[in-house]
UniProtKB/Swiss-Prot annotation:
Inhibited by 6-diazo-5-oxo-l-norleucine (DON) and acivicin (ACI). Residues 210-414 form the GMPS ATP-PPase domain. It comes from Aspergillus fumigatus (strain ATCC MYA-4609 / CBS 101355 / FGSC A1100 / Af293). It is found in: Cytoplasm, Cytosol. Catalyzes the conversion of xanthine monophosphate (XMP) to GMP in the presence of glutamine and ATP through an adenyl-XMP intermediate. Its cofactor is Mg(2+). The lineage of its organism: Eukaryota, Fungi, Dikarya, Ascomycota, Pezizomycotina. Pathway: Purine metabolism; GMP biosynthesis; GMP from XMP (L-Gln route): step 1/1. This is GMP synthase [glutamine-hydrolyzing]. Its EC number is 6.3.5.2.
Amino acid sequence: MAEEQNPSATFDTILTLDFGSQYTHLITRRLREIGVYSEMLPCTQKLADLPFKPKGIILSGGPYSVYEDGAPHADPAVFELGVPVLGICYGLQEIAYRLGKDNVVAGTAREYGHADLNAQRLDNQGHVDKLFAGLEEHVKVWMSHGDKLVKLPEGFHTIATTANSEYAGIAHETKPVYGIQFHPEVTHTPDGAKLLRNFAVDICGANPNWTMSKFVDQEILRIRKLVGETDHVLGAVSGGVDSTVAAKLMKEAIGDRFHAVLVNNGCMRLNECETVAETLNKHLGINLTVVDASKRFLDGLKGVTDPEKKRMFIGATFIDVFEEEAEKIEALAENSGAKVKWFLQGTLYPDVIESISFKGPSATIKTHHNVGALPKRMIEGQGMKLIEPLRELFKDEVRQLGRELGIAHELVMRHPFPGPGIAIRVLGEVTPERVDIARKADHIFISMIREAGLYDKISQAYAALDPSKAVGVMGDKRVYAEIIILRAVETTDCKLTLGIDGDFVLRYIISVMTARAFPFDNEFLSKCATRIINEVHGVSRVLYDISSKPPATIEME
């Protein structure tokens, strides 16, 4: 997305500068949840290079000590721009350290976990009391720091304390500059969203008008301007939420000049191709081509048992198949005097964040591309250009956008499905027969979850096929048949797992998203097992995986 066309060109924006915390992205998410648009950039960002002026700036937490050589520091222009500034944890220490090198020291006692915060009111002090306005005098907050502010910077008031932090909250006497030692962005700070709203709306004056209804209107206009009146766009779809929403958005913007391609790799869910074709083509009006390459994929998977080799083969073959179909579509377009100049990519904001997150003083910021999913002509620079209409959105915003575009609830709320499909849910060798068993068992399991009204309460659910077999008794005969493993999990993106990193600064490792097995009752699981064994030929046993993540992963391979 061209910078000048970012939502920041239209919506009041709070800029979050990332100092390396693994939950900086939650600041951005919480602000958007209250209707204020926010963008995250690395702390090395030079404000002079910004294409917009933020309404306010938030300095995130981080795993460093501000007084150490090589510690990251914000552009001095942050404090010269004339907009409100809020420092969180490391951000508080950054504000204090720049005003006095002895203001921050290594703490004698680390403070992490829940803490009782006492907010202090300073009457008749103008902006000073605004940060905690509407909050109780005593509130629960989440702390995770080792270093400590031991001196109040000149010109600041104390606005909050805890038993271990004399300066848990500070505010400048005359300027809207604030610092807090706790983390308002996590759910462990119950009133954190209120505090962030106080800062963004009441102190910064940001208009809380960030909605998907306004975004979709702006994005359609942007796409039309970018693509022009004659160029065509090509994109791969899978039936998943991201690709479906991106495809529908493109359809709304340029109509039949968007060409969607669905590749059947032989490892999709039961009736998936037919369902996706009906949804995208008939109901959403998307120009869709379905390529049945199932035999090509399954033949190539014979004898392959290593999960990574499965992924690599499926990924490489997908690119080959997609490329072949793309050439046909391009040829047809050229026959009518048009050209396919753009490739639709379903990049989301978390993908962008992963690329721009601050990883150290010498880290190189790279442009995010999911290279494994790009056609060769994109990699080799043969002319097609990327268009990424969802790259500024979080997953929950993509779902909201889907609803705004009229996509059915059942499709918008679909569980994630891995790119390699059932191939990585069939443990061991992938054969058509084994895929069929896993596919049918999965269909029964998901159908029963839907019938029980549990689907939207579960983050992901599926049936996998174990590489071993087990003895059973059917019709008074001994059988030696397949084992099905059922898995269903609840996940959260903001439940903190404590871990010490660097100078005892505690971080939550977002790449290890936590998940726990969904607590089905035994009667439900028993019914699932009975149906699968009775209806799927070749299955003698059904197990339920109760492992949490970590240490287990959500997928089997």
